[in-house]
From Swiss-Prot:
UniProt name for this protein: Pollen allergen KBG 60
Organism taxonomic ancestry: Eukaryota, Viridiplantae, Streptophyta, Embryophyta, Tracheophyta
InterPro entries: Poa_pIX/Phl_pVI, Pollen_allergen/Os
A family per Pfam: Pollen_allerg_2
Sorted UniProt keywords: Allergen, Signal
Family: Belongs to the Poa p IX/Phl p VI allergen family.
Signal peptide: 1-22
Entry-linked SUPFAM superfamilies: Group V grass pollen allergen
Tissue-by-tissue expression: Pollen.
Top-rank taxon, per record: Eukaryota
UniProt cross-references to Gene3D superfamilies, sorted A to Z: Group V grass pollen allergen
Additional notes on this entry: Its C-terminus might be membrane-associated.
Amino acid sequence: MAVQKYTVALFLVALVVGPAASYAADLSYGAPATPAAPAAGYTPAAPAGAAPKATTDEQKMIEKINVGFKAAVAAAGGVPAANKYKTFVATFGAASNKAFAEALSTEPKGAAVDSSKAALTSKLDAAYKLAYKSAEGATPEAKYDDYVATLSEALRIIAGTLEVHGVKPAAEEVKATPAGELQVIDKVDAAFKVAATAANAAPANDKFTVFEAAFNDAIKASTGGAYQSYKFIPALEAAVKQSYAATVATAPAVKYTVFETALKKAITAMSQAQKAAKPAAAATGTATAAVGAATGAATAAAGGYKV
């Protein structure tokens, strides 16, 4: 199952580079008959203060998706355990459909804006499909947890590239300061966002090289030069190797999309593993020890790719 979930992430390139599709088309398979069990740790968080004001069409769309996500979590929290998954999917599906419709119906402002909007819709659609796949085959007790956790992390990464308040799991939102064991993954997550932003501004054929260089530079800067690239984290290095294998003889733009998807999946896996793991005996342990605990937990749980 772990290998199947990781394979799904690698092949999301077909969804990301293809035409954007409404989430309504996915609801037919997004609400399976098996009822969900209670989800732990997803009670809605109280407002954490003013978020950055959305200015671009893309930012406004992400903000609406963010609001819809939190409304769906709140709705799921108020129904019996057996209805949580179905309620979340229905509520979030309606909100995201509305956001898509409003974004696509705005007055055209040029080919560049239309292209940017279409790219965002495609990435959002891919995030929804990834979340559904992550919950596919899960036990009733885990289905809601898996779906919401995967979707929230995917949306957070997408939102990060737009420099706007992103969706975060409620358990993370209620914390004023990240726990010590999350700080290393926070740096990796931040490096990913920097690299994705740089790649988005580069020509299609240069996105892959720009992303990889920016990602390594950001990691080096955030660790004070202690690490030169992503290779100090085994799970990331393994993800990169697999993404390279999947991009042989493909166009540069496609290669970048597969590479980005693979890293996104690996970072999400490590983040979830660290959140689930118990705090280390020494909260001031080294970065290497923290990363080792995270990757070890992920591997033990599901081959290193459980989300």
